[in-house]
């Protein structure tokens, strides 16, 4: 039996999330259907992180166990032949038995792409979040970036946890949080050990409230300390949320995540300011 890891990219707007559902309109369902067509047998997958409906992935990782002997590119080419245009296998690699897509991961990175202005941008529908503002007004990116820094470190993130979250503990570690502005765009990058259900979208709801001037930057710390979902802003839309990368120990030698997206290219250079 061989364990195979696959790197997956998908447009979440086309699906009802990652996890398999009876109606079959999920990323897991179409991926496993494609694997079954390619391999001729059912190949259940285990994913690094389940994404919600409308959430995209640039660097999702899954593993599967199989008795089939195929070279890595055969897994890529063969599976992609049966996938819709909204999903693609980017790489495949044979892994040791102790590799686990979820439990071996020590870091996950999410991006959020947000645009603002007097009207929505139809060509970005499903690909970016949006905030409608009167002409001449903008989001306060500096305040948003300042507010996000309170989230760094190990904290109880109950205030940002969905009611239906199944995680055993609300305590997670955030390694970095960054907010950058480019014209009528705001980009957010959050890196952490793991995330609760709706956690990033609930954080975004608070950041948007701060960016619009409805709350001061210090409010984020109050929300975090409250450990109460009712203290935070409403859950923000999924459209602009991307699972950008899943990090593993170097010993596994997994391929680097592909160039994430033209939306984010160059945004988070080390010396860029808010």
UniProtKB/Swiss-Prot annotation:
CDD domains: PseudoU_synth_EcTruA. Substrate binds at residue 110. Its EC number is 5.4.99.12. It is an enzyme of class 5 (isomerase). Pfam families: PseudoU_synth_1. One of its GO terms (molecular function) is tRNA pseudouridine(38-40) synthase activity. It catalyses: uridine(38/39/40) in tRNA = pseudouridine(38/39/40) in tRNA. One of its GO terms (biological process) is tRNA pseudouridine synthesis. Keywords: Isomerase, tRNA processing. NCBIfam families: hisT_truA. HAMAP family: TruA (MF_00171). Belongs to the tRNA pseudouridine synthase TruA family. Formation of pseudouridine at positions 38, 39 and 40 in the anticodon stem and loop of transfer RNAs. This is tRNA pseudouridine synthase A. It comes from Ralstonia nicotianae (strain ATCC BAA-1114 / GMI1000).
């Amino acid at each position: 039996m061989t364990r195979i890891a696959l790197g997956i990219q998908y447009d979440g707007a086309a699906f009802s999330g990652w996890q398999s559902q009876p109606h079959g309109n999920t990323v897991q369902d179409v991926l496993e259907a494609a694997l079954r067509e390619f391999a001729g047998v059912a190949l259940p997958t285990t994913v690094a992180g389940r994404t919600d409906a409308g959430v995209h992935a640039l660097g999702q990782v899954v593993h599967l166990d199989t008795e089939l002997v195929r070279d890595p590119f055969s897994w890529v080419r063969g599976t992609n032949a049966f996938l819709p245009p909204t999903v693609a296998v980017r790489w495949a690699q044979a892994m040791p038995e102790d590799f686990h897509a979820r439990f071996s991961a020590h870091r996950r990175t999410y991006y959020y792409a947000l645009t603002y202005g007097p009207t929505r941008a139809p060509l970005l529908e499903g690909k970016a979040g949006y905030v409608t503002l009167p002409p001449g007004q903008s989001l306060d990116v500096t305040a948003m970036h300042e507010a996000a820094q309170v989230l760094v470190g190990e904290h109880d993130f109950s205030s940002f946890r969905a009611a239906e979250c199944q995680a055993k503990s609300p305590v997670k570690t955030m390694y970095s949080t960054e907010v950058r502005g480019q014209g009528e765009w705001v980009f957010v990058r959050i890196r952490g050990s793991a995330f609760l259900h709706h956690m990033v979208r609930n954080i975004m709801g608070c950041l948007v409230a701060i960016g619009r001037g409805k709350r001061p930057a210090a409010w984020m710390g109050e929300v975090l300390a409250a450990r109460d979902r009712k203290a935070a802003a409403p859950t923000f839309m999924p459209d602009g949320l991307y699972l950008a990368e899943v990090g593993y120990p170097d010993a596994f030698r997994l391929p680097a995540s592909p160039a994430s997206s033209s939306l984010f290219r160059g945004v988070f250079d080390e010396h860029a300011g808010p």
